């Protein structure tokens, strides 16, 4: 319950106005950054998954998205996944569980870096580390 209270508080006090726009040939898609839970990759196509379980597919390299979002609390956890850290519930050996119980793979080579960055992120955002 405490985690959910923090989570709701953080979301309501986060920078609500900050958005990211994806501009493609024939369309523009806009998201509030704090509504994106994670991004999964299938080669050149990326699925952007929101907290409402809406999925939009864009054709932008995952590395480009990683660079654009890394200063907004997103972290690359696998060659095919970028996760918004506000939605991380737990980090286990080879997976990350999100607040909606979705499990994202965590690559072994990125594990230590992800843990270190998540702890720093959590401390900077008033999480209690036990």
Where are these regions (language model features)?
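Conserved binding/recognition cores within well-folded domains
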Residues: 2-99, 103-106
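Short, surface-exposed, low-complexity cationic segments
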Residues: 115-117
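Intrinsically disordered, low-complexity protein-interaction/activation regions
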Residues: 125-130
